[in-house]
Amino acid sequence: MARDIAAPSSVPTQHKELISWVNEIAELTQPDSVVWCDGSEAEYERLSEELVRKGTFRKLDPIKRPNSYYAASDPTDVARVEDRTFICSEKEEDAGPTNHWKDPAEMREIFAGEQGVFRGSMRGRTMYVVPFCMGPLGSDLSAIGVEITDSAYVAVSMRTMTRMGQPVLDELGTDGFFVRAVHTLGAPLEAGEADVPWPCNSTKYISHFPESREIWSYGSGYGGNALLGKKCYALRIASVMARDEGWLAEHMLILKLTPPQGESKYVAAAFPSACGKTNLAMLEPTVGGWTVETIGDDIAWMRFGEDGRLYAINPEAGFFGVAPGTGEHTNANAMKTLWGNSVFTNVALTDDNDIWWEGMTEETPAHLTDWKGNDWTPESGTPAAHPNARFTVPASQCPIIAPEWEDPKGVPISAILFGGRRATAVPLVTESFDWNHGVFLGANVASEKTAAAEGKVGELRRDPFAMLPFCGYNMGDYMGHWVDVAKDKDQAKLPKIYYVNWFRKNDEGKFVWPGFGENSRVLKWIVERLEGRAEGVETPIGILPTREALDTAGLDLSASDLDFLLTVDKEVWREEAALVPEHLNTFGEHTPKELWDEYRALVQRLG
């Protein structure tokens, strides 16, 4: 299977630049062999079997979970490493205050200098060349990358998460543009040295070079650190491409909402982690006659079409979801998606060779093998699955995937939602006055870090646009880009922007809104607003539903609870507004003037 890289006849592309780059990386990393991935089913099976032989994969019960595998990572390699994630822009100012910057020349020396960590890093291993496309092949909204990796786990995962293999090389032609992504586990094998099931290195670097559109990742085999099409390309590098080319690369789900009568609407929504993004993307509405279908659960690439509307694609081909908390009662559609063809990492194993995690079932099994390989019972006092345990599954298996989820033209976005986890102050749903006010709402996305004292605003963790860990350039400039993309557009065709909060708590510390499927009631009001059919009331912070406009029929929600969810307390909001300048000042002169205008207008409206 290994091909001699030096013989052009054995290389499945005529792209000179790509061939020369692959040769260059092979020379640097010194793998035993080089394999160009073709993305075929046969290749997937072969690599999966190799991973089983190595002990990385364990095949799950073929009847309960066909063509599915279990993997347990090294206990030190379980999540994204934000403190080891670098933006290596030419100027430090371009990375901004919320990213870790490193001088690109210095970083290249660390990687490829005389003592560079990539030097010989693939010794004793196979180097896989993984051509992949973010978005449907052939779409004007899509973009190509090539990941070089010494991890077969990455190669098989990329087949699920992206369009991968020979069709991508065919699309690339002889001179097409591609983002260069280099990944090594940083675990070379000397001759005769035994391998471990999950190789990695205690030193880790996840580095992005925005100007040259490159990603270099060292030392981790896990998730977003290693599947470089996901956060590294689709958000950090793509956000820079979007800035330069006038589009948006966003940490957003995309869903299709169809009322009993009338046209379907497409909605994009950005929430920080642990705010129920995947649950909303796969929502089962409780409102009669309404349907939700999924376009994407994590990332949206959006461009303005010739008709002046904003069109979005889901650049991914799979779901890489957090397993714990996903269950029949929280996300039945995700559970149905996971029937087979899935890889589960760091979940627990049942005695009959299936998987389990916290929140998956009402009843906890009496005995499991936990993610570290230990015997586990409910008395163990530790989680059976790691809190960041993941599933990797083709999006096409989702029972409510929209037929147009791979439409190369994308889908027209009518509404954009922002939201965080706020126990206090923030109402259930707020419509922005206009686009710039909506950008102001997005810029102030926050979740509470600490429990708030009664009536007080708790300490906030700001996560503008839910992009804080994923923006590839200065966050102040990024906010400015949101203002700029709409400047010359027909305002009537822009998506309306909303801020939602499912997480308000009462004085007893209990959630007031039931959430989950009931969130469809809020979506219903939004669609009716878009159609000009629903009442709204102007408040100092935006437009809220009137009590009658929000459909609460059949909901166990008292009038006082509804008032609580739809009231703007001016005094609390003066406190809230007082926190904004410190946040906007973080970005200094990079903060767009328009956001300061919005802040001053808010203060004035609050009186």
Swiss-Prot record:
Gene3D superfamilies (UniProt xref): 3.90.228.20, Phosphoenolpyruvate Carboxykinase, domain 1, Phosphoenolpyruvate Carboxykinase, domain 2
BP GO annotations: cellular response to glucose stimulus; gluconeogenesis; glycerol biosynthetic process from pyruvate; oxaloacetate metabolic process; propionate catabolic process; response to lipid; response to starvation
Record key words, sorted: Cytoplasm, Decarboxylase, Gluconeogenesis, GTP-binding, Lyase, Manganese, Metal-binding, Nucleotide-binding
Residues holding substrate: R80, Y222, G223, G224, S273, N388, A389, R390
Binding site for Mn(2+): K231, H251, D298
Recorded superkingdom: Bacteria
Pathway assigned to this chain's UniProt record: Carbohydrate biosynthesis; gluconeogenesis
Presence of the UniProt keyword Repeat in the record: no
Molecular-function annotations in GO: GTP binding; manganese ion binding; phosphoenolpyruvate carboxykinase (GTP) activity
Cofactor: binding details: Binds 1 Mn(2+) ion per subunit.
Requisite cofactors: Mn(2+)
Catalytic EC class: lyase
Family: Belongs to the phosphoenolpyruvate carboxykinase [GTP] family.
Subunit structure: Monomer.
Protein name: Phosphoenolpyruvate carboxykinase [GTP]
Organism: Streptomyces avermitilis (strain ATCC 31267 / DSM 46492 / JCM 5070 / NBRC 14893 / NCIMB 12804 / NRRL 8165 / MA-4680)
